[in-house]
Amino acid sequence: MSKKLHIKTWGCQMNEYDSSKMADLLDEYEGYTLTDNAEEADVLLLNTCSIREKAQEKVFHQLGRWKTLKDKKPELIIGVGGCVASQEGKAIKERAQCVDLIFGPQTLHRLPEMIDQIRAGKKAVIDVSFPEIEKFDRLPEPRADGPSAFVSIMEGCSKYCSFCVVPYTRGEEVSRPLDDIILEIAQLAEQGVREVNLLGQNVNAYRGATHDDEICTFAELLRYVAAIDGIDRLRFTTSHPIEFTQDIIDVYEDTPELVSFLHLPVQSGSDLILTQMKRGHMAIEYKSIIRRLRKARPDILISSDFIIGFPGESKQDFADTMKLIEDIQFDHSFSFIYSARPGTPAADLPDDVSLDEKKERLAILQDRITQQAMRYSRQMVGTVQRILVEGPSVKNPMELRGRTENSRVVNFEGMHKHIGKFVDVEIVDVYTNSLRGVFIRGEDEMDLRRDLRPSDITAKYKQTDDLGVSQFKPA
């Protein structure tokens, strides 16, 4: 009987990526298969997030539920990873004796050894260190799960915004070597992946080493990835305004694989609040980036992050944020009420905006952006959109579901042979959370560019060392 693994994941897309790597790692090295049922698992892993309020209490509530499973099954192994694990360390074990493993985002690759130590009789293993890029060297080859894939290009953040825990929980910025990223994407393309989303806490700070000890910028990386045959759509998340340089904007002008959609967090439209947040830019600088982007790519849509009720946020500060929203005309946002994160500089500021005021401002902001998003959706009616077909429609399995460049779900009638491929559809109707399309043409009628075959990369340049680590080595 195969061993079973259950992973519960909270938080950002990076955590989702990390959890998928944990599953691949334990499958390859330990033979574990994933299960959605915690009661039948041999190993339970909780991948935590410390961004939201009461993150620690949420963790201990979950561990309390899992303790009852361990009481019935003493050999059950329970592990806690992610940002709360990185923050709290051994304090988790002191409060929850049922926990066997505590590991940070940079040490998840050591899970097989940690599990072996517990099996050998060790009472607890705690490793929340920051071993830089070693994590990526030890992970198994990627496995495609559908036509779209996330690829981590860097870890950590060095910006130290006053409200954010990321530099303390994931460490400072560390970029993966260019060749490793290209090889991973080529391997995914060989498995049928058509869309890649480059992932990091601050992707546009990417500065990866090349095989000849030069430095590859983020703009250069985008062009390298776009040239790989089969990768016909390219996204990235998340970026920071202060490093959204002109060379990145230039890629939008000449690289059609890069989608006409950008998530660029701003957090506030008030210069005073931006200064308090230590964001390193003013509202006018943010608007300048968007203006230059729209000159390079007129149809680009923008989404952002907003924190509502930051300490000291006055009615005028909030009005400045709403003015920025009106000026930019955002298509989407992730917006939250401010709550202090322990250990951050902002936690020492007086939280002087009432909860009722925060809720009212949040509702106003979200309503405005929802209206703007619906307007953009209605403007798409009658247009032909290229979508990547992800699978059957959720509500009607006899239909298909795909996604536009600007991340809208489109349902349409079509043949299942189109799953995993691009099709063109005409948008004929708009709903709250999706669009309705009519099939126009399939991929065989498109003139998709072919530059660099993935097999040329994986076959010619792949080198594997004695430890089984594969690297991309240009000849």
UniProtKB/Swiss-Prot annotation:
The record's catalysed reaction(s) read:
N(6)-dimethylallyladenosine(37) in tRNA + (sulfur carrier)-SH + AH2 + 2 S-adenosyl-L-methionine = 2-methylsulfanyl-N(6)-dimethylallyladenosine(37) in tRNA + (sulfur carrier)-H + 5'-deoxyadenosine + L-methionine + A + S-adenosyl-L-homocysteine + 2 H(+)
Which keywords belong to this entry?
A: 4Fe-4S, Cytoplasm, Iron, Iron-sulfur, Metal-binding, S-adenosyl-L-methionine, Transferase, tRNA processing
Which stretches make up the Radical SAM core domain? 143-375
**InterPro entries, alphabetized:** Elp3/MiaA/NifB-like_rSAM, Methylthiotransferase, Methylthiotransferase_CS, Methylthiotransferase_N, Methylthiotransferase_N_sf, MiaB_methiolase, rSAM, rSAM_horseshoe
Q: Which Gene Ontology molecular function entries are recorded, alphabetically? A: 4 iron, 4 sulfur cluster binding; metal ion binding; N6-isopentenyladenosine methylthiotransferase activity
Q: Tell me which EC number(s) this protein carries.
A: 2.8.4.3
| Span of the signal peptide | none
Binding note for cofactor: Binds 2 [4Fe-4S] clusters. One cluster is coordinated with 3 cysteines and an exchangeable S-adenosyl-L-methionine.
Sites where the protein binds [4Fe-4S] cluster 2: C157, C161, C164
Q: What family is this protein classified in? A: Belongs to the methylthiotransferase family. MiaB subfamily.
Know the name of this protein?
A: tRNA-2-methylthio-N(6)-dimethylallyladenosine synthase
User: What is the scientific name of the source organism?
Assistant: Shewanella halifaxensis (strain HAW-EB4)
